[in-house]
Amino acid sequence: MLVRKLTLIGAALARAALALQQEDFVVNGELLPGVREIDRAEVPEMHAGLMPLEEDEDGRALFFWRMGEQCGKRCSNELIVWLNGGPGCSSMDGALMETGAFRVAEDGKLYLNSGSWHTRGTMLFVDQPVGTGFSRPGRDGRLRTELSQLADDFLLFMERYYAVFPEDRRRTLVLAGESYAGQYLPYFADAVVRRNAERAPEERYKLQNVMIGNGWVDPDLQSLSYVPFVSSRGLFGPETRNFQDILRDQEACQNAINHGPAKGFSHPECEGILPKLLSSIPGPDRPVQQCINMYDIRLRDVFPSCGMNWPADLPNVHKFFGTPGVLEALHVDPQVAGPWVECKSAVSEALVNAHSRPSVHLIPGLIEAGVKFVFFNGDQDVICNNMGVEMLIAELRWRGHMGFSNATENFDWYHSDADAKTLVAAGVVKRDGPVTFISVFNASHMVPFDVPRISRGIIDIERSATILGVKGDSRMLITVDTEEDVTLSTNAERNQQIRHNQLKRLNGDTRKFTIAVFGLTISSIIGVIVYFSMRLHYGAKIRAILTNPKSGTSSADDFSMDDEYTGTVMGDFHHGTHKKGQYYAVPDTDISSSELHSV
């Protein structure tokens, strides 16, 4: 009944969408800072704006940014919907720091992303739930409280979106995202499957895959992974502060799970483990108290932020959206939207899920309905770590068995550039029919942020666009950049270098200006001192000639300059071989192509 009701609403919205045309959402790239310095051939066709979910023009609406595919030989006619998590965090994180066509430099200008996923399909970044990013909740200001409501909104959005972009309806639909999107994506996939069941074949959405990166899928089981994960990194033991308390919390969580499903969304006994761990594992002694970064265990942050000041590019994104004219170019009214906020706590606090189950319960049914799942995980993440994701997969039932079966294929994943002369260890892959797990080496909670070009290989693995090889007793799965990828990477690195040089010159000019001003100030002070010294010496004669000595006045101006830096302390971690547009090198893992044997 609910799906039929939504269908009727969607049909009404589709009719209303006739009033909206693609031209209403066209983004003139040259209005975005930095794009004029990029080769036009490298700039994708873009559309953006607010897609209404109601016929009321001031009603609920979701903001989207569409980047058309530029994929050459690897085009597979896919629409990849990307969602960030939170809940309440903007998918512009994904658009400008992860899988989109651009990254943002320190001055707020765009440069090419060498690992953009739009070289594999059309990317659609959506701010949701309502109230997130530039999306609006409507006249009444109501925010969503249940995942099922979010799924309803997503269906309405897609109905309206496809009416405006009918060519995308013919594409295969891939739902992708990270973190709390591990809740969104299965719910949205389930809504699509139920919708399709009531539609004629030609009217069905072509949902094929769900790709969850460092996903929050099973809150209870994943909470049990924190202690063993940090222990495996040598950060937790008997000497740890609150050691016994944390072990008691771990035991209480396990016992609660053993006694059956939670009455709410998750067991309260499991929710306190990570916060207590973060407060108990300090960083090296510093003037300020530090803790591990919950999104990248290699990093440190100021307590109690513990990762909330991360990633490093975040201030650049704020600067981009704060540049005059940017919001107008994206068809957003700055007077209505206000400044961009990455994550809105009000949205997170509203989504209590009093009547929703964790998405893990939907996955077996989706697999039976023919939906494939790819779980990819950066191996340096704490909050949604590898152990927790593998634990939840082990509890999933599909094709009559629990977890990965004896038929599971295991691969060492290597990534190669186009000439295939050297390979870089990228991760490990487990594949069992419709379920794939990928552990990505040297990557954080945001895999594409750390290893952009390697992250693009995840899509190739999902499509089986890979090479198989053997090295010793190990089976190898190899992803290879296309010629178009190499061209994009070369142009991206050149574009990035231009931005770097411009910033360097700008900073140099600023420094010279500062030195000149400082020098002029010092000269002025010296001049004033000399002047008053001479005045003290010759003052009587001057006053006698020019003024009445009894009416003279004096003044003194205090001069001070405070150049103290008060930025966030992030610890001593150095990325080493990491560089935007390149790889993290894994020591002693380069392999010559001569060592490969095809199978």
From Swiss-Prot:
Membrane topology: Single-pass type I membrane protein
GO cellular component terms, semicolon-separated: membrane; trans-Golgi network
Cytoplasmic-side positions: 534-599
Gene assigned in the entry: KEX1
Sorted UniProt keywords: Apoptosis, Carboxypeptidase, Glycoprotein, Golgi apparatus, Hydrolase, Membrane, Protease, Signal, Transmembrane, Transmembrane helix
Protein name: Pheromone-processing carboxypeptidase KEX1
Glycan attachment positions: N406, N442
Family: Belongs to the peptidase S10 family.
